[in-house]
């Protein structure tokens, strides 16, 4: 069975690739989890973030946006000293701001799914990826979404982070053409 080259790095990567990456997400909780994980990934390997994922879920109230929106200074400081956390002050302090912005956006559009797919007219983007070198780091789409999200109060949400997010939640299918997951939406 052929799979994308990056998925061969570890068991964490393979499992994530085979079961999640590029599969269409419809659940707001999952969207928020992926926004957090992609934000934490900046400057780190995705494999490292996947290894920390279970611990992050434990200390971040299972990625519950309503709970994270209420985090105060004491909670943020405790996260910075927790070994399960990715200890980057900017990333940790962006959590409650992003949670509040996420909840406001969901209230405005009815769901994050409705918001994100308005940028693609309700359609998935399926790219022609012959090999890993063909995969872009960002796109005009991720630039537009990043810009809009920043206007809405999100932090630590650049075009590269958003592109990775869009891949992860299935808005963009960047599986290599020969990968068995290419074109699978759910």
Describe each model-derived feature in a short phrase:
Residues 1-186:
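HhH-family (HhH-GPD) DNA N-glycosylase catalytic core used in base-excision repair
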């Amino acid at each position: 069975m052929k799979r994308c080259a990056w998925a061969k790095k570890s068991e964490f990567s393979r499992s994530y690739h085979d079961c999640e990456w590029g599969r269409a997400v419809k659940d707001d909780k999952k969207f928020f989890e992926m926004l957090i994980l992609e934000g934490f990934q900046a400057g780190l390997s995705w494999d490292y973030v996947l290894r920390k994922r279970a611990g992050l879920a434990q200390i971040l109230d299972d990625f519950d946006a309503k709970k994270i929106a209420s985090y105060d200074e004491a909670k943020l400081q405790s996260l910075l000293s927790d070994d399960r956390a990715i200890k980057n002050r900017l990333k940790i302090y962006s959590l409650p701001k992003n949670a509040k912005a996420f909840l406001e956006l969901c209230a405005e559009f009815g769901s994050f799914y409705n918001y994100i797919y308005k940028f693609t007219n309700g359609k998935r983007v399926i790219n022609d990826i012959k090999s890993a070198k063909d995969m872009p780091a960002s796109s005009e789409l991720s630039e537009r979404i990043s810009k809009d999200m920043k206007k809405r109060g999100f932090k630590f949400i650049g075009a590269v982070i958003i592109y990775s997010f869009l891949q992860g939640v299935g808005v963009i299918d960047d599986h290599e053409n020969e990968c068995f997951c290419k074109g699978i939406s759910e």
